[in-house]
Amino acid sequence: MAAHKITTTLSIFFLLSSIFRSSDAAGIAIYWGQNGNEGSLASTCATGNYEFVNIAFLSSFGSGQAPVLNLAGHCNPDNNGCAFLSDEINSCKSQNVKVLLSIGGGAGSYSLSSADDAKQVANFIWNSYLGGQSDSRPLGAAVLDGVDFDIESGSGQFWDVLAQELKNFGQVILSAAPQCPIPDAHLDAAIKTGLFDSVWVQFYNNPPCMFADNADNLLSSWNQWTAFPTSKLYMGLPAAREAAPSGGFIPADVLISQVLPTIKASSNYGGVMLWSKAFDNGYSDSIKGSIG
């Protein structure tokens, strides 16, 4: 009996150790949704390459605007045209892939006019995409794991309020995708709240802090970002040269040899974010074995 108890205790210990190791493991986040030729959401998750998939984008919201989900050529959310994605979201979740709704984007029309406006947007997102209830759920009944803030226009006001309101619902993963120059023009105050579980910094299309012939500026900027309060910090990169017209692409072999060894030493290193699935033609395959 004593031996049985010891064996059981050890089994539980190793199981819990495995769970904690896997939850702390580094991974790859990818954006999906802005190119109808990039494959389905289900097939994206089935690659086994990604820890997070960000569905992009809720491109219009706030300041009295009707919210608009823009999934490019994948589907039209009008008349429940994207509800079929519910099964694909659940398929992703069954494979331990976290699926987030990315709000904003580079070409959206969005802003928050007040703290009350931020609260209304939070309620809309919760009821339409997360654990709440609404007659209109553009992605069907599936419950997304959280919200990604890809805020690239407008002011920096009230995004911290939106983050807090979403966190108040409980069990909502929050991520942010700031540009690499510090401070970020839109998300600086929000990120400094410490509410974001993951921050994947866009180290591309920004010459002062991206890879260009060498990694000096990139790694200097990374070191500054490690001081921000987030559980996991990711290096955001283009998945192909054409994904970032203003630069920042790092060949896979260079990333593995010149960049990852340094950033993996950071205590809050979380992995790599890629823009986007449409451009990921083998890049994630090449780097995934070196991310952790």
Curated annotation (Swiss-Prot):
| GO MF terms held by the record | endochitinase activity
Instruction: Cite the entry's keywords alphabetically.
Output: Carbohydrate metabolism, Chitin degradation, Disulfide bond, Glycosidase, Hydrolase, Polysaccharide degradation, Secreted, Signal
Q: Which InterPro entries match?
A: Cts1-like (IPR045321), Glyco_hydro18_cat (IPR001223), Glyco_hydro_18_chit_AS (IPR001579), Glycoside_hydrolase_SF (IPR017853), Glycosyl_Hydrlase18_Chitinase (IPR050542)
- Disulfide bond: present as a keyword of the record? yes
Q: Where is the signal peptide?
A: 1-25
Q: Do you know what upregulates this one? A: By salicylate and upon tobacco necrosis virus infection.
Main localization, broad class? secreted
What does the UniProt entry say about where the protein is found?
Answer: Secreted, Extracellular space
Looking at the record, the residues that make up the GH18 domain are 26-292
Task: Give one GO biological process term.
Answer: polysaccharide catabolic process
| A Pfam short name | Glyco_hydro_18
UniProt keyword Secreted, yes or no = yes
Q: Which family does it belong to?
A: Belongs to the glycosyl hydrolase 18 family. Chitinase class II subfamily.
Q: Write out the function statement from the record.
A: This protein functions as a defense against chitin containing fungal pathogens.
- Name of the protein in question: Acidic endochitinase
Origin species: Cucumis sativus
